[in-house]
Design a protein with these regions (language model features):
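A short, well-structured juxtamembrane/interface segment
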Residues: 1-11, 162-176
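Acidic catalytic cores of enzymes that act on phosphate-bearing nucleotides/polynucleotides
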Residues: 175-214
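Glycine-rich phosphate-binding loops that contact phosphosugars or nucleotide phosphates
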Residues: 10-154, 185
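Flexible, glycine/charged-enriched surface loops at secondary-structure junctions
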Residues: 144-149, 165-171, 209-210
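A general structural motif
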Residues: 47, 158-166, 207-214
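Residue-level marker of positions within ordered structural domains that often coincide
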Residues: 140, 161, 204
């Protein structure tokens, strides 16, 4: 709530997300929510604009959110540093309270997911989406969304009680798959891209995420 109060006092006109990989997909999800329910335009940063080209960015009236489960992504931190030089309000979303990004941001949104033991980040992706959805809901004074977010832990617990069995039933069909597509649209595009990435990382198959509208 302190962050949202600061945002409203500053008259933020754009949200600029800096992230890589899985965290980039969580940022896509947040972009849809903030654009839709808050009404503020969003953009995904191209970190190389800062790290490779030292590009000029005008982010004075922007909220710049760096997303990284470890909080140690050097290029994401570089974008946050550039943004702060421009006078932007900076926020870090990480799973490490002592990380460089957590220490640098004007605000830190802690995922509090515990140690991420999977190389292909899983629970930290889910927690990033949850934290960013909470930001969108509070910023947009969306009581209905906040109520739905309160239901998430119970829904996840219920899902985990039966989903492994369902996966066992369908997995045989795809055992020898060499490539595939993950189709979606809207907020679920973040899930499509993340599913694509996870299948590539863990099974070494060629995958592509597409919006069905394309």
């Amino acid at each position: 709530k302190n962050l949202v109060s600061d945002i409203k006092q500053r008259d933020i006109r754009m949200v600029y997300f800096a992230a890589r990989g899985t965290s980039d997909h969580a940022s896509i999800y947040a972009s849809y929510l903030i654009s839709t329910y808050v009404g503020v335009p969003t953009a995904l940063a191209l970190p190389s604009v800062v790290t490779a080209y030292d590009g000029k960015l005008c982010l004075k009236d922007a909220l710049v959110i760096g997303v990284s489960q470890s909080g140690k992504a050097a290029d994401v931190l570089a974008v946050m540093e550039k943004a702060k030089q421009c006078g932007a309000l900076t926020v870090a979303v990480t799973n490490d309270l002592q990380s460089p990004m957590a220490q640098f941001g004007d605000y830190h949104l802690y995922c509090n997911a515990g140690l991420e033991e999977s190389v292909a980040a899983t629970k930290t992706f889910t927690s990033q989406m949850y934290v960013l959805a909470m930001l969108a809901a509070v910023w947009g004074d969306n009581e209905a969304m906040l109520a739905k977010l309160d239901e998430v832990p119970g829904a996840v617990e219920q899902l985990l009680s039966y989903i492994p069995h369902d996966i066992e039933k369908i997995i045989q069909r795809y055992r020898y798959m060499e490539n595939g597509f993950v189709l979606s649209r809207g907020t679920s595009m973040a899930i499509a891209f993340e599913t694509m990435l996870k299948l590539q990382e863990t099974n070494y198959v060629k995958m592509k995420g597409y919006a069905v509208s394309d």
